[in-house]
C-alpha cells in the first residue's frame, strides 16, 4: 500500500511527458479542461506530445493567417508591383535577382493572359 501512495505517477501521468513545473501542480490543475466555450485544440500539444512533428507540418501546411484579399486580381497586382518596387530599390544582389525573377514571372503571366484571350476568341 505504501508503494502505491509514494509513487510519483498515477494513471495517465505515467504515459505522458510532464515538466517539473507541471509536476509541482496538483493533479486537477495538470489535466484541467478548458472552460466551456473554449476550444480544445490549443491544448493538443500539452495533451499529446508524441505527434508534434506531424502537427508542426500540418501547421506549416495550413497557416492561421490567410491572404483572401490577394484573390482579387487588382489587389494581387498592386501588392506584386509594390513588392517588385521594393526589391528593385534594394542594394542586395540576392534581392535584385529576386526582382528579375519576379519580372520574368510577370512577363510569363502577361503572355499566358494574351494566349488565353486569343484562345477564347477562337
UniProtKB/Swiss-Prot annotation:
Further comment found in the protein's record: May possess both an mRNA signal and a syc-dependent signal capable of directing its export through the type III secretion system.
Quaternary structure (record): Interacts with YscY.
Keywords assigned: Coiled coil, Plasmid, Secreted
Lineage, uppermost ranks: Bacteria, Pseudomonadati, Pseudomonadota, Gammaproteobacteria, Enterobacterales
Localization, UniProt: Secreted
Keyword Coiled coil in annotation: yes
Major localisation: secreted
UniProt remark on domains: The region between residues 50 and 110, which contains the predicted coiled coil domain, is essential for interaction with YscY.
Protein name: Yop proteins translocation protein X
Function: Required for Yop secretion.
Cellular component terms per the entry's GO annotation: extracellular region
Coiled-coil regions listed: 71-87
